[in-house]
Curated annotation (Swiss-Prot):
Family the entry assigns: Belongs to the synaptobrevin family.
Keyword vocabulary terms for this entry: Acetylation, Antiviral defense, Autophagy, Cell membrane, Coiled coil, Cytoplasmic vesicle, Endosome, Lysosome, Membrane, Phosphoprotein, Protein transport, Transmembrane, Transmembrane helix, Transport
Site label Interaction with STX8, positions: 33
Residue positions where Phosphothreonine is found in the record: 28, 48, 54
Membrane spanning residue stretches: 76-96
The protein, known as: Vesicle-associated membrane protein 8
Intracellular or extracellular location(s): Lysosome membrane; Late endosome membrane; Early endosome membrane; Cell membrane
Amino acid sequence: MEEASGSAGNDRVRNLQSEVEGVKNIMTQNVERILSRGENLDHLRNKTEDLEATSEHFKTTSQKVARKFWWKNVKMIVIICVIVLIIVILIILFATGTIPT
């Protein structure tokens, strides 16, 4: 009878050891996943910082380009207005006879 209870006790111990080993493996996998996730988060944070710096540079550059083309446009408008004004003055002067033809 002692052998039967001893054998049953050994089976229970083996079952418990097997369960403990299974839990140990699961916990090891969980820790590895957590570490991997931490590494991925660090990588993602670095990419985010790089994108932020790049976006600031892009914003500054695009503002400079927009300002440059705005001034170019203003200069062109002023030149066209001056040319039109000169043509109108010449037409008026020819029409009034101030400038002989």
